Each structure stands twice: as C-alpha cells, then as structure tokens.
C-alpha cells in the first residue's frame, strides 16, 4: 500500500493467510509507516510520524458474522511549531516524552534569512489491543438493495503504553425494500475515544471529523465541530452521524453501475474532554463543544453514484437545514452545497 499526497505519506506492507487452520481463521501481518502534516486538508500545521507493526486474526462465526482480534505496537513522534494550534501544542507538552527544540536562525546570504523558531516535540510508544465484530447480510457489496451490515470495533492502549486511551466505533447500514424497486437505506455511525491513566486527552490523530460527502452533505468537508485557535477544524472525541436515503429505481441496464437517491443527513462531532480550552472567533471568549441535540447539523438533497473504472463517482447537491450563521463569538458553519468525491458506494 503506497499513498503519497500533499498532507500525508503512508507506506504499508501486509500479508494475509486466509486459512491459518482448518476452521477458516485468517491471519494478517502488517507493517506501516505514516508521515502526516495535516489530518484533514483544512487543519492547522501538525506533524505526526509513526511506525507500527501488527498481527490480526479474523475468525468466522457464521456465514454472515465474524470476529477480529489484533495486537499492534506503534512508535509515534509529534511535532508542533508556531503554525500549530494552541490545542495541539497543549497535548504535545503534556503527554509522552516532551522536549523543546530550538531551531536557530539560518542565514543563506544576500538577504535570504530564515528566522529561528521553537518546536515542541513528543515521542511515545503505544501497544493496542483491537477487538472487532461484524455482521453483513447484504445481497451484494456494491449497490446492495437488501440486507444489513453492523460493525463494532474496540481499541485499547495497554497499561504499559506511554499514552493510554480507548476508542470505540460502531457502524450500521441497512436496506429496506418498500414496494417494487423502491428501497430505503439507513446508516449511522458513532465513534468515541477516551483518555486513560495519566494521559490528558486522546492523541489528536484519534480525533473524529464531520461534514462532507461521507457524513453530513451540504457542509464543507471536516469543517463541523470543534475549531482550534486559528479557526481551523480540530476534530473531537465524539462523533454522531446518521442518514436516510430513498433509492430511486434505476433502469435494469444501469442498475449494476448507477444509483440515484433523495437523502436526509444529520450529525456532528463534539469534544467531551475538559483538557482542551477552546476560544471563539474573537480569540478570547471560552466556548465549549459538548454534545447537544440542537448542535446536530441537518441537510437534505439529491445524490447520484456512478461506478466508473477509477472507482465510484459520487455527486450530491444538498440544502443545509439548520446552518449556524455565527454570533460574533462562535464560528459560523461553512456550507458547500454541491459536492463530488470518488470512493466507496453507500
């Protein structure tokens, strides 16, 4: 797996033995290197470098169900500087093996000088136990029209880790035939992470984001929820999203490669930890991003998915229903009605 972009570089090697024993247990060995400068394209600068190795076992329970158990060891280095948000610098200064690095001024002559700066760095090792359960009865993986899928994943940083936390993710997807070729599709996702022991908050790279084609359409990608000291998305440790779609019947010859729908999306991300101190648009007034039903953003619109040789092209046009316009203190929501992405089908 090789993935190199403007904000991240991911290099991974994995090997799967689908039949480790006669019971159909699969074993996967993996080695991954990540170098990330921004967790999403709109984030403030934040350098994260990690090296991990893991082993994962998948055990089939029934035709539709399976269990997964895995262990991984990871060494992470996080660096923040003057272009980093105050919240990120807070975390780096309070967790792991924190050190301050002074970068001296560099004079290249002819008036070209790079001023000196101070970097905050931390390094830590974590050892994660991952347990997962899945159920999938869909009639097909792509453009399904009946059946359901559940996925539950629990990740726990073992007590001898330098940074301790736990993360839980639950995904739900179901297709319900109504009449003829008309079908309703429902989906929901809940993600939560919690610090443990002396750790002040889950690592920033464990934050969840919302807004955009995969969560709440009609709002700019990853722009919902907590904002850092520069007004950029910082993410949160709690994510709640859901959607409902009415799948419009497609002519038989297009049914395997195209789909249109009318949708309703709802969701947001929140920060339930007391460690971070967020401020509003004025840079002074304290603001909170705790969970609240009135903070769940909603939108409705139309969507089209088309299976092309490069992947599934997804187009949507959404009308946000409860955009927060800002009040001089809290940041306003950012709308983006037409959205396009290439990725997994709904």
Name the predicted role of every residue range.
Residues 87-113, 198-223, 271-300:
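Solvent-exposed, glycine/polar-rich loop segments of beta-barrel outer-membrane systems
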Residues 2-4, 29-35, 69-75, 148-156, ...:
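Transmembrane beta-barrel strands of outer-membrane/channel proteins
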Residues 276-331:
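C-terminal structured "cap/appendage" subdomains that terminate the fold
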Residues 1-142, 148-149, 217-218, 222-224, ...:
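Gram-negative/organellar outer-membrane beta-barrel architecture
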Residues 180-277:
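Extracytoplasmic gating/loop element in the C-terminal half of outer-membrane beta-barrel translocons
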């Amino acid at each position: 797996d090789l993935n190199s972009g403007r904000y991240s570089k991911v290099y991974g090697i994995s090997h799967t033995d689908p039949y480790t024993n006669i019971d159909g247990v699969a074993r996967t060995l993996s080695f991954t290197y990540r170098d990330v400068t921004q967790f999403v394209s709109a984030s403030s600068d934040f350098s994260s470098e990690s090296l991990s190795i893991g082993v994962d076992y998948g055990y089939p329970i029934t035709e539709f169900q399976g269990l997964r158990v895995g262990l991984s060891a990871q060494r992470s280095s996080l660096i923040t500087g003057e272009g980093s948000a105050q919240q990120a610098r807070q975390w780096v200064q309070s967790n792991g093996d924190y050190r301050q690095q002074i970068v001296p001024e560099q004079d290249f002559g002819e008036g070209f000088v790079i001023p000196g700066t101070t970097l905050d760095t931390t390094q830590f090792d974590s050892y994660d136990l991952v347990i997962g359960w899945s159920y999938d009865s869909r009639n097909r993986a792509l453009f399904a029209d009946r059946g359901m899928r559940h996925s539950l994943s629990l990740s726990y940083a073992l007590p001898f880790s330098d940074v301790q936390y736990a993360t839980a993710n639950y995904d739900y997807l179901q297709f319900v035939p109504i009449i003829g070729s008309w079908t309703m599709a429902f989906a929901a996702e809940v993600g939560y992470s919690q610090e443990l022991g002396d750790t002040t908050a889950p690592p920033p790279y464990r934050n969840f984001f919302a807004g955009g084609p995969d969560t709440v359409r009609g709002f700019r990608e990853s722009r919902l929820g907590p904002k850092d000291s520069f007004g950029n998305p910082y993410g949160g440790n709690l994510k709640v999203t859901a959607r409902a779609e009415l799948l419009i019947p497609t002519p038989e010859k297009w049914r395997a490669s195209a789909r249109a729908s009318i949708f309703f999306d709802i969701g947001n991300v929140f920060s339930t930890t007391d460690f971070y101190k967020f401020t509003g648009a004025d840079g002074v007034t304290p603001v909170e991003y705790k969970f609240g039903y009135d903070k769940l953003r909603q939108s409705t619109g139309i969507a089209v998915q088309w299976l092309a040789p490069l992947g599934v092209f997804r187009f949507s046009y959404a009308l946000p229903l409860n955009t927060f316009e800002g009040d001089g203190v809290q940041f306003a929501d950012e709308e983006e009605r037409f959205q396009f992405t290439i990725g997994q089908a709904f």
